[in-house]
């Protein structure tokens, strides 16, 4: 039997035979994709057609050696600080993530407690109504009772989310909460209610969670027997269906009918998550299944309410020190609304913004000290890691040069950082006061937060009389929030004003300057309340009633003017935009273009750019030193795509291949081949400067592989039947 060809010693055949013969194509094993050429050393001294390359050693000059030593030190420092920034990012983001999880858990805690109380009260009433005898409980068939006893107690939990992505974590938290209270809990998703698996798949899923993971029988009697063993009957059985509206209606109806037949032997509580309305199951369940449900309604907090709670905990309370600029906040709000208000999309945006900040800003390592509550670590340790290059970068920041801070004030850097750390305290108090006033007009904290971040503070124009007239004639969407707050003050009742002042007093309790201004409003508030009480006296003459009405309106107007004055005082004195503070770039992410590119993405543009700069991706030294010159050691796909830039919309495959072949076989190799054929005496030469050129079949295979990769990435369109020798470019430029 003839030996087969190997990679090192390919059989000699023509290009036509190698591509047309099916036997050769199946049995001939050739490397058709080469990332970088391997060393051309002669392994074991027996491989033919491979020659050794001469290794040339040059002693570097002292200047080059010194320069390379400095570059290596700088490279080590850069790697050290890059690693350090990534570690600080993990610290900062872990604190932000934990804060968000705690906020979401607390926002649903009341509803979760209400669901558990409802389960316990209903379970105790079922037990007290009359427990089954042991002989009846262990029977393998349901007990015949009245129709009312076949009602399946159901909790309809309204999530008010358009996307299920936010509900997944909510129902996981609900499952953990009920299990911690001693309930037997199983959770089913909409995937379990498929028409293919039927109700048997649902029953098997329940038995695997309740009884044993290896159960493969869809028999509800197993559940009944398990419930009466090992004191399992002392706790209720809860089944959670997290996304009812996506379930197969007939399968869910069959499961409800089966479980209701066993409701006496196994007190089962069904929790159904709905996102649109409490009566959504009417659209998917059968009439018989609906009659078996005894529903109780529960409503979770809305996505906007959860968003406000997260925003308050992350940006307005001491958390990590990280914040965003005005433009970034506007983009995050727009992205949040475009993603159907899903909190998961906002958290994802926040994480990418935080990661981009640490990757772009060298001074972001200082944020680690902002994570420590009540600990002043910015004076010594925070500035020890600042190298000369980092310090130069710090004093070249736009906020530093704008405030005319020079390098001579280096010792003041810790004080500037401490000011950054203390600044959010009064700032956040004012934002929360505005939020309390905006609640009467259903304003969201996210809208107020975005407008207050405006570095130009255009909202202050609304407090001058001339600008008030202009604002009434020219609507400005940017200042809409503050205008709405001021307008709503005129429509508030005395009780609403009193409630707002009480909340302001609680918010500003630790900040005496603002708290004193709020306390000064109490006498005016008492006058308004007194005027309101006189207006409400019974049997008062119409003349006195009209006087008291005008008196109340006068007192209310005076009161609202005083409140507007306090709001103006808070905004002017304490609402200093973060982008106007020196060194704010340390903790504030401002590059909205980077964030937009990371979120929305431009995969085709990214692929094109990587192909044109492949030496940076592969860290190839030989390619990067030659600049834009094409070399045989480059990636085949990168070579082919760079050659495609020289063609128009339509590329001739033959010309493209010849250009590709020219790169892989330099002119020096061709000249050597000619010299070898002409001079027989130099046939046994074993050492040459360059390796042997690849075979024609190998070049064609590499060309086909590179063209296929460009087609998969969507950069070219393959030949058509009309023009089989041409391909068309789909994307242009980089």
UniProtKB/Swiss-Prot annotation:
The keyword Chloroplast does not apply. Follow a cell-cycle regulation with a peak at the G1/S-phase. Mostly expressed in siliques and flowers, and, to a lower exent, in flower buds, leaves, roots and stems. Keywords: DNA replication, DNA-binding, Nucleus. Transmembrane segments: none annotated. Pfam families: ORC3_N, ORC_WH_C. Its main location: nucleus. Residues 12-24 have a biased composition (Polar residues). GO terms for biological process: DNA replication; lateral root development; response to sucrose. Residues 1-25, 532-554 are annotated as: Disordered. It is found in: Nucleus. The keyword Secreted does not apply. Component of the origin recognition complex (ORC) composed of at least ORC1 (ORC1A or ORC1B), ORC2, ORC3, ORC4, ORC5 and ORC6. ORC is regulated in a cell-cycle and development dependent manner. It is sequentially assembled at the exit from anaphase of mitosis and disassembled as cells enter S phase. Interacts directly with ORC1A, ORC2, ORC4, ORC5 and ORC6. Component of the origin recognition complex (ORC) that binds origins of replication. DNA-binding is ATP-dependent. The specific DNA sequences that define origins of replication have not been identified yet. Belongs to the ORC3 family. This is Origin of replication complex subunit 3. It comes from Arabidopsis thaliana (Mouse-ear cress).
